[in-house]
Amino acid sequence: MGSAAVQGPLWGRAPETWSTTLEQKMRPLYLATLGATGPLEGKTYLDAGCGAGQAAADAAARGAAVSGLDASEPLLEVARRRTPAGDFRVGDIEELPFADGSFDVVTAFNAVQYAVDPATAVAELARVCRSGGTVAIGVWGDPSRCETEGLFARLRSLAPPPAGTPAPLGVSEAGVVEELLSKAGLDVQGGDEVAVPIEFSDLDQAWTAHTSAGPLQKVIDTVGTDPVRAVIEAVLEADRKPDGSLRQDNVMRYVVALKP
C-alpha cells in the first residue's frame, strides 16, 4: 500500500485551515527553494506532495506551467482554485502518474518523509524530471534546531509509531537527502538552510492550525482530543517568548540536484 491510502484521509480533514495557516508558515522554504532552482519562466514544474498548492502557485507566478500531486483530494481542490491552469492529481509519491522526463523542475516539500519508501519516492522524482532538469527537496532541518520538534516528540509519546517505523525526521539527518538524490542518479549541487518561525497569536489559533496537519489527526484518532490539546498548550506555553508571543523557531533546509 502506498502513502496516499494512509496520508490522504488524514491530511484532507481541514484543507482550508491548512492552506491559510501552517502551509503559509512554510512559505519561506518554498520561496527560497524556487529561487535556487533558477528562472522558471516557460518551464514545466511539478510539486510532489503539493498540499493545497502554495508552492505551485508561487511557481506559476514566476511563469512556470505547473502540476501537482498529493494524497489528499480536498487539499488538491484548494490548489486548483489557487492555480486554475495547473494540472493537479491525486496519487502516490512512490508512483507518480506522469511520463518519464515530463518536467524541467521537480520539488517535494516535507513530503518524502511520509513516503512508505523514501528511496522509491526520490527515484520517482528523478524519473519524471527531464535530462538537464532540476530536482529539489525541502525538509525540516536539524531537529535540535527546530523547536517544533519538541512538540512532535511529545505527541509521538502519546501514540508511539509501530516498531520499525522510520523516524519522521529521519530524512533531516545530515547527508540523508543528499544520499537519496545521489542514489537516484542525480548530481547534488548543494542547498541551504531557511529560518521558518511558527508563530501564533494565542493558543486557540495554535490548536486550530496544528490540528489541520495529518500527523496530529492520527494522534487524535488514537488518544482523543483532550490529551493532544494539553500537550500543545503545555509545549507552546513553555516556548513562550519574553515578548509574550507563541513562537517556535525552526530551521528548514533544501537540497538541489541536477539530472544528467
Regions found by a protein language model. Name each.
Residues 34, 57-60, 119-126:
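A structural alpha-helix within SAM-dependent methyltransferase catalytic domains
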Residues 119-120, 130, 134-201, 217-218:
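Conserved catalytic/acceptor-binding region of the Class I
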Residues 94-105:
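A short acidic, Gly/Pro-enriched loop at the edge of an enzyme's catalytic core
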Residues 44-95:
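Class I SAM-dependent methyltransferase SAM/SAH-binding core
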Residues 105-118, 141:
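A short SAM/SAH-binding and catalytic strip from SAM-dependent methyltransferases
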Residues 39-40, 100, 122:
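A short, aliphatic-rich alpha-helical micro-motif
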Residues 7, 23-26, 52-54, 169-260:
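Conserved Class I S-adenosyl-L-methionine
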Residues 1-41, 54-58, 75-78, 82:
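Conserved class I S-adenosyl-L-methionine
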